[in-house]
Amino acid sequence: MPAPCALKDTGRYAVRHNPATYFTAGDDRDACQRDDVPLGTPESGALADALDQDVLPAFVFVTPDLCNDTHDCAVAVGDRWLARWIPRLVESAAYQHGATVIFIVWDEPTPMPFVVIAPTVVPGTAIGETIDHYALLHTTEQLLGLPLLGATPNTSAITTSLGR
């Protein structure tokens, strides 16, 4: 993302992958400008600074650009992107405190991995049921203590698999 709350595709940034840009009621546009900021790198930028200062917000949504999400580039490119970010996240104080969950998901219609990384997850845990974006939304809402939106009451949260 080239600038906070960018509303136009630019280079490898696709606005369609950024949910914050679709909220337009009330103070949403101001909140988008304030809180929807470029990721940066594992070494510098908004997320790296928050990790260094141990001031992560309650919710962080990260979507890679069109190359690092492997839509337009080889899977190995996305693997390298994750290989730089995941260690940075799990070595952070926020993660070590046990309050952070990392979800790695894809937006493809075919069966895809759904990866959950958290200090509370027992290594080797496998979820035997189908997980979709509604289950992720339900889980996120439950973890944040938010009311359930739309169709999420009809899905199962995966919080028991998170050890919570």
Segments predicted by a language model, with ranges:
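N-terminal pro-sequences and low-complexity stem/linker regions of secreted or lumenal proteins
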Residues: M1-R164
